Amino acid sequence: MANIVFKLSDKDITTLMSRISFDTENLPQGMKARAKYQNTTVNIYQSGKVMFQGNHAEAVSEELLPQHSQLNTNKTKKKNMANSFLEQTLMYDQFNCIGSDEAGSGDYFGPLTVCAAFVTKEHVPILKTLGVDDSKKLTDTKIVELAEQLVTFIPHSLLTLHNEKYNIQQAKGWTQVKMKAALHNEAIKNVLEKIDSSQLDYIVIDQFAKREVYSHYALSDIPLPKKTKFETKGESKSLAIAVASIISRYAFVTYMDQISKNINMTIPKGAGAKVDVIAAKIIKKYGLSRLDTISKKHFKNREKAQKILKPL
């Protein structure tokens, strides 16, 4: 199935929407309008990007956006030439892969989020056009923009371990490695239920532990062990991992924004000195028990925040 993306001005989007009938209600977050036309899905996003999906995507885009279609084709050819070496080095992008990654493990505040995503060879050009990259290189704003588009067409599973449950499991002796292994394995199994596994070439996990350690903590067997690979710096080696990273980071960032609104403070990410100061302010205003509902209790920040409040 072909996927073609354009970046349009508000004027061009208005013109496009006047040419065929679009639905504008009950749409996923981040989507402005959607239409079905000649066996092709046309998605218009709030970001100004328009995606054509389907076997006739190219023909439909040429019909509805004749001028832009030709410009986009020329740009794509140039970009493909520039990326030719990159495509040779990214082996996994030549195959249909499930990638998995997590967010929040190094942050005192907020949950642990894990995503697994299925990316096919056909998805690769559209993902590159959208600008999918290592989430650590992307701003939070860009992550939100990308994720809201990705979740509309990439089969995925997103799991969130909220702080209260996280702290309960940690108190029982669960390490972060055990939590992540269990969540990654569950997310991967969820995605396998959504796809035809005969089309799957590899499962690529952004490595946080060696295979034997992962297998020990995963709570259940690795679904397809012969197809499963563990890669350090996986986001730079597999677009499937990059997509999973963006979606998991999106969930984490969104939750952090919600925490900030709920307590009327800007909650910093990470586990540095700024985090200690904000944690101390939360204890002073709301109490230690409230702090524990939005943070990971075993981090040293909790102790440091309490020391800040002690009189000199």
UniProtKB/Swiss-Prot annotation:
A divalent metal cation binds at residues 101-102, 206. Endonuclease that specifically degrades the RNA of RNA-DNA hybrids. SUPFAM superfamilies: Ribonuclease H-like (SSF53098). Manganese or magnesium. Binds 1 divalent metal ion per monomer in the absence of substrate. May bind a second metal ion after substrate binding. Pfam families: DUF3378, RNase_HII. It is an enzyme of class 3 (hydrolase). Keywords: Cytoplasm, Endonuclease, Hydrolase, Magnesium, Metal-binding, Nuclease. Its main location: cytoplasm. This is Ribonuclease HIII. Its cofactor is Mn(2+); Mg(2+). It catalyses: Endonucleolytic cleavage to 5'-phosphomonoester. Its EC number is 3.1.26.4. Belongs to the RNase HII family. RnhC subfamily. Coiled coil: none annotated. InterPro entries: RNase_HII/HIII (IPR001352), RNase_HII/HIII_dom (IPR024567), RNase_HIII (IPR004641), RNase_HIII_N (IPR024568), RNaseH-like_sf (IPR012337), RNaseH_sf (IPR036397), TBP_dom_sf (IPR012295). The lineage of its organism: Bacteria, Bacillati, Bacillota, Bacilli, Bacillales. The keyword Zinc-finger does not apply. It comes from Staphylococcus aureus (strain NCTC 8325 / PS 47). It is found in: Cytoplasm. HAMAP family: RNase_HIII. GO terms for biological process: DNA replication, removal of RNA primer; mismatch repair. Residues 95-311 form the RNase H type-2 domain.
